[in-house]
């Protein structure tokens, strides 16, 4: 009879553990190595912020009203002050909602990167490619332990590509406690999209009719349409390529690529009437700040609404001023420098942990004091990287390996 034992090879620095499963003959059946990055104590990440490279947009893409992918800025929106005293629930019954049960992986981001590389004839120099949402979870980890997360990662051509583990996301939704509030949760989620519709124009103000502007409260809300910015940024020694949705622009894009863009992030929150609500808003500000910080969005406009969804006030926040504003409150719920330093430490550690191909899992259990990383597939890249992107990279490498011809020299 074959028996199994588990030999624990040990813990060192509280950051790495390895499990090897063996049978009675002493031959390995399989091996799983789990590395763990400790979040606590958070105090070790305090102090002056690590150097951050200003996010610079180098490409963009859009989804149209049917959520069809488009290279370019077709779905860019312009900010224009919304009317107040508008019911944010209005039009919910006609809401055109994107089906996010479909796993879109990194497909759109990779297609956009490949298009950029075709124009420049060289690969981007990022150490990590991912969505803004994944980096937001990582940066918020020291102060947000209620919800866990899972991500899939793979190493390809020296770069780590990270996506959300869609199966975990769907399972977490299915296991959520039933909502017992007076207003359905779906309606409250709709309020944010309604506020975006009330606050944006599809063209600059000078090209938009007064009738269109004044009729915005009656417009059908469609969250399938999106503009996504792709930026190059960096935290410490780690260069990042991040893609993420941008709600609107304040004026217009600069002519020179890489120059700062006056983006606007739109958010909603309950009117603050007591200390508990003030504390909740301060916690919300952390996510607001991280999301805008990562893409270089300088301005956040919050629509404050009543408990039943009436928009009563808008307030503008400067992204770079939010951490200091929170710090001045005496007993801050979070610290921006700590978020940056934690992300720097984790990303450097991750780059030394994911060092070969296969599919890796990045996992943080709810209320856990560590982030685990372990391999779930020994070879390949799963569905994280598309065949089209890999074929393009092979083609690019072959092109770069070719010696210059006389024709090429003449063209130059």
Swiss-Prot record:
Its main location: nucleus. The keyword Amino-acid biosynthesis does not apply. Substrate binds at residues 228, 245, 267, 291. It comes from the Eukaryota. Decapping enzyme for NAD-capped RNAs: specifically hydrolyzes the nicotinamide adenine dinucleotide (NAD) cap from a subset of RNAs by removing the entire NAD moiety from the 5'-end of an NAD-capped RNA. The NAD-cap is present at the 5'-end of some RNAs and snoRNAs. In contrast to the canonical 5'-end N7 methylguanosine (m7G) cap, the NAD cap promotes mRNA decay. Also acts as a non-canonical decapping enzyme that removes the entire cap structure of m7G capped or incompletely capped RNAs. It catalyses: a 5'-end NAD(+)-phospho-ribonucleoside in mRNA + H2O = a 5'-end phospho-ribonucleoside in mRNA + NAD(+) + H(+); a 5'-end (N(7)-methyl 5'-triphosphoguanosine)-ribonucleoside-ribonucleotide in mRNA + H2O = a (N(7)-methyl 5'-triphosphoguanosine)-nucleoside + a 5'-end phospho-ribonucleoside in mRNA + H(+); a 5'-end triphospho-ribonucleoside in mRNA + H2O = a 5'-end phospho-ribonucleoside in mRNA + diphosphate + H(+). GO terms for molecular function: 5'-hydroxyl dinucleotide hydrolase activity; GDP binding; metal ion binding; mRNA 5'-diphosphatase activity; phosphodiesterase decapping endonuclease activity; RNA binding; RNA NAD+-cap (NAD+-forming) hydrolase activity. Interacts with exr-1/rat1; the interaction is direct, stabilizes exr-1 protein structure and stimulates its exoribonuclease activity. The interaction also stimulates rai1 pyrophosphohydrolase activity, probably by recruiting it to mRNA substrates. Its cofactor is a divalent metal cation. Pfam families: RAI1 (PF08652). This is Decapping nuclease RAI1. GO terms for cellular component: cytosol; nucleus. A divalent metal cation binds at residues 196, 247, 265-266.
């Amino acid at each position: 009879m074959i028996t199994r034992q588990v030999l624990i090879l040990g813990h060192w620095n509280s950051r790495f553990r390895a499990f090897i499963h063996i049978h009675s003959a002493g031959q390995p059946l399989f091996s799983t190595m789990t590395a763990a990055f400790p979040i606590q104590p958070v105090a070790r990440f305090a102090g002056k912020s690590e150097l951050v490279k200003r996010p610079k947009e180098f490409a963009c893409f859009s989804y149209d009203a049917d959520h069809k992918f488009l290279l370019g800025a077709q779905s860019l929106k312009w900010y224009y002050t919304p009317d107040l005293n508008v019911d944010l629930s209005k039009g919910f019954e006609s809401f055109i909602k994107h089906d996010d049960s479909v796993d879109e992986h990194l497909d759109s981001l990779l297609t956009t990167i490949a298009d950029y590389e075709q124009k420049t004839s060289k690969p981007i120099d990022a150490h990590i490619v991912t969505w803004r949402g994944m980096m937001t979870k990582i940066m918020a980890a020291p102060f947000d332990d209620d919800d866990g997360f899972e991500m899939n990662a793979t190493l390809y051509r020296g770069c780590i590509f990270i996506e959300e583990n869609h199966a975990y996301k769907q399972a977490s939704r299915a296991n959520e406690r039933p909502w017992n509030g007076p207003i359905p949760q779906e309606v409250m989620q709709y309020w944010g999209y309604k506020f975006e519709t009330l606050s944006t124009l599809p063209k600059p103000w000078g090209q938009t009719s007064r009738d269109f502007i004044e009729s915005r409260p009656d417009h059908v809300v469609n969250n399938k349409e999106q503009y996504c910015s792709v930026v190059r940024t960096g935290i410490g020694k780690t260069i990042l390529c991040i893609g993420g949705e941008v709600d609107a622009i304040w004026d217009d894009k600069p002519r020179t690529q890489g120059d700062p863009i006056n983006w606007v992030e739109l958010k909603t929150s309950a009117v603050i009437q007591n200390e508990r609500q003030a504390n909740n808003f301060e916690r919300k500000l952390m996510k607001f700040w991280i999301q805008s910080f990562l893409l270089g969005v300088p301005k956040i406009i919050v629509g404050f609404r009543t408990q039943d969804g009436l928009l009563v006030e808008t307030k503008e926040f400067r992204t770079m001023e939010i951490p200091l504003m929170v710090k001045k409150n005496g007993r801050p719920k979070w610290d921006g420098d700590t978020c940056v330093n934690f992300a720097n430490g984790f990303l450097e550690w991750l780059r030394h942990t994911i060092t070969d191909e296969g599919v890796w899992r990045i996992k943080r259990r709810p209320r856990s004091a560590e982030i685990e990383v372990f391999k779930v597939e020994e070879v390949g890249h799963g569905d994280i990287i598309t065949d089209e992107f890999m074929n393009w990279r092979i083609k690019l490498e072959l092109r770069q390996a070719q010696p210059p011809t006389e024709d090429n020299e003449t063209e130059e």
